[in-house]
Amino acid sequence: MDKQSLVILDGMHRYNALKKLGCQHAPACLVEYDDERIGVGAWFRFFNAKEPESLATAALESLSQKYERNTTSHQNDPTRATIITKLSNFQLIAEPDKLARCCLAVRIEKYISGQSFRCEYAPENAVTQWLNSNANLVIPVPIFSKAEIKETATSGRLLPHKVTRHIIPSRPLGVDVPLDLLINYTSEEANEKLDRLLSSRRLDRKPPGSTVDGRRYQEELLVFER
């Protein structure tokens, strides 16, 4: 959350879920969003699929998308593609805006996952090494600027799950709190109880590049362990 504007920059889906559960509060990590150390990337979807060329074609045709197919090359901009395989680059003929492209990426992900293939999320820069990996199909998503993320958040529009990837100086993890604390207390009481709760846990500082729960992070991690 931006410390100045209090705009929720990441985690809107979790925030909405808490609201539906009747929570009055939510734990938040406040950041100076204009800090140059804070960067924005994206989460690409990686699959190890059987017959990826046919699967990509079937996914796009099932969603009534008109596309052109070109040979995959290191010179291609991966963020402009809709689906990439090790042989082909599938790109829409009529390119929608960034938000629509994100929504389409999620629909394609659901289609391919529905064919019993497991999706793995990795940073956009992982696509440069993927030709040497087991993955053979990638669904890229556009990369938003900070200004675009702020504009989207303040307009009330919601980006799909796991699209933006924020890189912050230090990322807290394991801030697990009982729902009771978020529902039945005032802000002052909830903050005091949260402070005591986190102070009672062991803090494990992990260096950039560490993996937690199958996800690799570029920033330092502050993991609150039970």
Indicate where each model-derived feature is located.
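Charge-dense, extended regions
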Residues: H166, L179-R226
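Amphipathic, charge-rich alpha-helical segments that serve as recognition/docking helices
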Residues: E32-N89, E148-H161
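A C-terminal functional module that forms or caps the active site or interfaces directly
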Residues: Q115-Y121, I168
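A short, basic-hydrophobic beta/loop patch
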Residues: M1-V7, H13-N48, I167, F224-R226
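Long, compositionally biased intrinsically disordered regions
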Residues: L104, A126-E188
